[in-house]
Amino acid sequence: LIYISMGTVNNDMTTFYKNCIDALGSSDYQVVISVGNQVDIKLLEGYAASSNSKAEFCILPYVDQIAVLQKADVFLTHCGMNSVSEALYFKVPLVMYPQTNEQKGVAFRVDELGAGLYLTDETVMGIQTAFHEVIQNEMYQKHAGEISDSFARCGGCKKAVEKIVEVFA
């Protein structure tokens, strides 16, 4: 399963979504695209249907991201901190396409840690190449798993509360 979401704010990206459909159409993957409410879903569904693709596209305004990430093989994301943290928690490697400076910082760090690939070419070929690299190179999955394991070692909410109390005591 490939999951694509550009977040809830800056997601009016019809041309980019069409490029993703073209890039992934020859794959055997199920592709879930969460586009928000600014994009004409019927237009994208029609575009996907007319492309004679092998991939199965599911285009929705919003999805239960946690549920989708538990099944995803790769996540193309805008690199919001929550989205990236959730993906890495579930050991999902990333194709990263940040839109803001904060998101670029998150993408830079994930790239540095080897758990994702920074998408610099938003053309059909660029998107296709990025997905191929992340899917074929097991390093991304391995590093996403290592980050997930480090999250587990942090101790969760209970440990966070203990630390806060310790600092302010």
Regions found by a protein language model. Name each.
Residues 20, 31, 68, 76, ...:
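Hydrophobic, well-ordered secondary-structure elements that form the walls
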Residues 1-74:
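Donor-nucleotide binding loops and adjacent catalytic segments primarily
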